[in-house]
Amino acid sequence: MATPTELGFSSPGGGGDDSDDNPPQKRTSKRTASETATEEETKKKKKKKTKHNTKMASPPSNRIWNEEDELSILKGLVDFRAKTGLESKIDWDAFYCYVKGSIHVKVSKCQLMSKTRKLKKKFLDQMEKIDQGNDPHFTRSSETEAFGYSMMIWRKIDAEYTNGVMDKAHQSESGEEVFEEDEEVALIDKGAAKSGKSPHEAVVVVDKITTKKNGTAGKESDDDDDDVLCAVRDAFETTMMSQGLSDYQKKLQLEKLMNLGTGKRRELSNEWKALCVEELKLNINKLRFSAKLAEAANDGK
């Protein structure tokens, strides 16, 4: 028979004390897990906020030009050449005044010339890859449109570039940037600028000006007639060279054209230039349609 002491030791009260010790430990464990989860969520929120603030505090991009600006420059160059009749010579003062309104930020003439040069190099690099058998892959309609405009402007010098004879830029005495070969710059002479003419009034063809050493513009010479002869020759080579004529027949017909009277030659020259302008406009419309077509194909609508 158990003694009172033994009964008291094993009494329900003692068992109750043991049962009362366990629940607080479990509750403490649950609180710790909950608090840990809350702290982790708080840390994650702080990290996200820190990253967001870092992005907001990052310095703005130094990029000046966007894709719309590049298209404005290229389209402006095509339109400007069509209106002025300057195929290979550009008056950058007049072109700057012509195109600056379509650019979303204010840029200088030097920045415009530099950007144009970069666009030219980009196009020539693309053509070099195409000649190597690598077709371009345009993912945006703006890229297709830019390439088409570049073709209108610089396709004549593509062969020279791919043969390693890319024309180089140099500085003229008046500080204007000049491009050799097909992108010569028709600079406004200092003397003409002093006469008070605006850039739009001072658009001149370099072939028509004899520039003196002191910087004043000379009188128009026989270069005007040379320009007419060049236009007639270009018209003949473009339209008649593919007619299946022999070399002798071509030479004979060209000599006859060169010996025409001044009035008749000028008439043919003016008509050919007008046709070239119309062809440029047609190419622009085709290019815009191609861009819309490519965009519709990409969207699938």
Swiss-Prot record:
Do you know which InterPro entries this protein is assigned to? GEBP (IPR007592), GeBP-like_DBD (IPR053932)
Please provide, in alphabetical order, the Gene Ontology terms of the cellular component aspect for this entry: nucleus
Disordered as annotated region, ranges: 1-62
The source's superkingdom equals Eukaryota
Provide the tissue specificity. Answer: Expressed in the apical meristem and young leaf primordia. Detected in the vascular tissues of cotyledons and leaves, in hydathodes and in the septun of siliques, but not in roots.
UniProt GO BP:
regulation of DNA-templated transcription
* Compartmental location: Nucleus
* Keywords from the named record: Nucleus, Transcription, Transcription regulation
Q: Where is the composition biased (Basic residues)?
A: 44-54
- Return the annotated region ranges for Non-canonical leucine-zipper: 268-289
Where it mainly occurs, coarsely classed, is nucleus
What is this protein's function per UniProt? Probable transcription factor. May play redundant roles with GEBP and GPL1 in cytokinin responses by regulating the transcript levels of type-A ARR response genes. Involved in stress responses. Plays a repressive role in cell expansion by counteracting the positive role of CPR5 in this process, but does not regulate cell proliferation or endoreduplication.
What interactions and quaternary structure are annotated?
Homo- and heterodimers. Interacts with GEBP, GPL1 and GPL3.
Which family does the similarity line name? Belongs to the GeBP family.
Task: Quote the protein name from its UniProt record.
Answer: GLABROUS1 enhancer-binding protein-like 2
